[in-house]
Amino acid sequence: MNHKVGFVSLGCPKALVDSERIITQLKAQGYELVPTYEDAGVVVINTCGFIDSAVQESLDTIKEAMAENGRVIVTGCLGAKADVIKNACPDVLHISGAHAYEEVVNAVHQHLPPPADPFTQLIPPQGIKLTPRHYAYLKISEGCNQKCTFCIIPTMRGKLQSYPMAQILTEAKKLKQAGVKELLVISQDTSAYGVDTRYQQVEWQGKTVNTRFYDLCEQLGELGIWVRLHYVYPYPHVDDIVPLMRDGLILPYLDIPLQHANSRILKAMKRPASSENTLLRIASWREICPDITLRSTFIVGFPGETEEEFSELLAFLKEAQLDRVGCFKYSPVEGAKANDLDNPVSEDIKEERYHRFMQVQAEISRNKLKNKIGSTQTVLIDEITEDQIIARSKSDAPEIDGLVYLPKISGITVGSFAEAMITDSDDYDLYGDLEYSLA
């Protein structure tokens, strides 16, 4: 019998972690992963359903797999809208929602029974990872308690469920032992970690720690590898972790989605509504940790956004001088409360505001990177091509931030650290020469 499984993972890093866990279980039970539809006995597709374009990509992928294989199991965020999937592809074998690991594995069992004698010893202790060996995503919770009007994640993934502290730290240790040099801490709401447990006290390596954001960061910092924080909601207690960055326990990098600067728009989004307070906090963080890199994301064209309110966002951007910024044009997501707001912004205006926003940020980024010329940066080697080395600095998360390009020399390996002298820059990337390897 064919025990081969095809797997397609769509969407964000949180979905990628879900895929890794499903694949780890399947591999532990003796299934073989194959890269083509035609070789697979069944195909699993982990979908995204956050915005319309993601829904369409997921549906297109399901249709393609059905056409080329015909035996398809669907899971992930779009699985919460089973009727949408069934209307497009009525013959899929099974549909489940996000983080339904056991349900997916059971569905595979039903339609493609496992081998009688799985070679479980072939599974590494850290599980199967879909990222390069030197970095890994570490998911610390599921779900979200926020009620942002533009988002339906709580509907698809449920309320906050923090993973046990010992489970997270054990996984982190195994990843380090497997050679991982960088942990990217992710969840729907990273800084809310532990709220649902009422900060339960647990024992870890002979000491008592609280199930809360600060304690988790402190314990991860003791691993001695890069720890990068993503999706950090701007709660007041986020201020407490900045000294950990200053002291080198975790990377001086904070991914903190702010979404807008105008107070009326923020209230309509049900987000923290004080750009003045945010600017004061940013100044405080930089005073405590001058090397901190601040990344954020914003939405332009939110329903009712006026030209004056958009101009306020641009003014905030210029004053905040954030290091890394992403921007999204508002997209009405089925089920989001923001869809009911008056005065939707036209697509032409959204597009125009998006380009104006990105022009402002490109200039900010260009000037910030120009100031790094002549400095020495610790970099992590991501890739070595025929003629160059591609790396990232402490300021750069994989996939979403800039890169450091270096001339190729011998003795450097992917996943190693090195010191690089920066000689040039552009809008988003740095260029330099290797000074020496840190191994």
From Swiss-Prot:
Cofactor: record remark: Binds 2 [4Fe-4S] clusters. One cluster is coordinated with 3 cysteines and an exchangeable S-adenosyl-L-methionine.
A Gene Ontology term for the protein's cellular component: cytosol
Required co-factors: [4Fe-4S] cluster
E.C. code: 2.8.4.4
Stretches of the chain forming a coiled coil according to its record: none
Key word Iron present: yes
Major location category of this protein: cytoplasm
Protein family according to the UniProt entry: Belongs to the methylthiotransferase family. RimO subfamily.
Function description: Catalyzes the methylthiolation of an aspartic acid residue of ribosomal protein uS12.
Name assigned to this protein: Ribosomal protein uS12 methylthiotransferase RimO
Organism: Legionella pneumophila (strain Corby)
